A protein has these predicted regions:
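Short amphipathic alpha-helical segments, especially helix-boundary/capping motifs
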Residues: 7-11, 41-44, 83-84, 95-97, ...
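Long, charged amphipathic helices and adjacent flexible linkers at domain junctions
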Residues: 68-96
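A structural motif detector for beta-strand N-caps
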Residues: 84-86, 90-92, 98, 102-106, ...
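Residue-level detector of alpha-helical recognition elements and their boundaries
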Residues: 27, 49, 79-82, 137, ...
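General secondary-structure edge motif
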Residues: 14-17, 47, 79-80, 84-87, ...
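Catalytic-core segments of class I nucleotidyltransferases/pyrophosphorylases
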Residues: 1-72, 77
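Short, solvent-exposed polar/charged micro-motifs at secondary-structure junctions
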Residues: 54-59, 92-98
Length: 156
C-alpha cells in the first residue's frame, strides 16, 4: 500500500488545515492534500506502508470495532510473547497503557484499563474489570471483581 504526501511536513500541515468535507459523502479526503500540492507545483512522494492497519480508514462503528479488535489482538500478542497467559484472547481486553509482569494469567472476559499494573504471577479472574489499580505479585483477583482505582472514594 502506498500513501502519497507532499514533500515536506510544512506543506502537509498547511494542506491539512485547508481540507474540507464538501463532497457527497461529507468526508475529509487525504488525497486532497496531494491535489493541493500538485496545483501549487509542489512535489509529492510515496510512502510505502506494509501494514495496512496503520493507515486503515474508519467511517462507521463497524469499522471502528474492527480497528479496536486488531489493536487488542496486537496488545495481547505482545504480552503473550512476554510470558503473560491469556486463556481466551477473543474475550480479553487490555489497554495499551496497562503493564503486565511475567507469568500473569488473564482468565476469559478480563478487562484491564487505564494505568493498571499487574505483578508477576498474579491471576485475574474471569470477567473482572480492573481500572487504574496495582495488583501485587502473586495476588488472585476473584472472578467478576470490579476494581477501580480511578473512582473517587465514597463514604458509607
Amino acid at each position: 500500500m502506498r500513501i502519497y504526501l507532499p514533500a515536506t511536513a510544512a506543506h502537509l500541515r498547511a494542506a491539512l488545515a485547508t481540507l474540507g468535507a464538501d463532497n457527497d459523502q461529507g468526508e475529509i479526503y487525504l488525497t486532497d492534500v496531494v491535489a493541493r500540492a500538485h496545483s501549487q507545483g509542489l512535489s509529492a512522494s510515496a510512502l510505502v506502508v506494509s501494514d495496512h492497519w496503520l493507515v486503515e480508514g474508519c467511517n462507521d462503528r463497524a469499522q471502528l470495532a474492527d480497528l479496536g479488535a486488531e489493536l487488542n489482538r496486537r496488545v495481547l500478542r505482545r504480552w503473550m510473547v512476554e510470558g503473560v497467559g491469556v486463556v481466551d484472547p477473543s474475550s480479553t481486553r487490555v489497554d495499551v497503557t496497562v503493564e503486565l509482569a511475567r507469568d500473569v494469567e488473564l482468565e476469559p472476559g478480563a478487562l484491564l484499563r487505564g494505568r493498571t499494573r499487574v505483578g508477576e504471577g498474579a491471576r485475574v479472574g474471569a470477567y473482572s474489570i480492573l481500572t487504574g489499580v496495582d495488583i501485587p505479585a502473586g495476588a488472585v483477583v476473584a472472578p467478576f471483581s470490579l476494581l477501580d482505582g480511578d473512582a473517587p472514594a465514597r463514604g458509607v
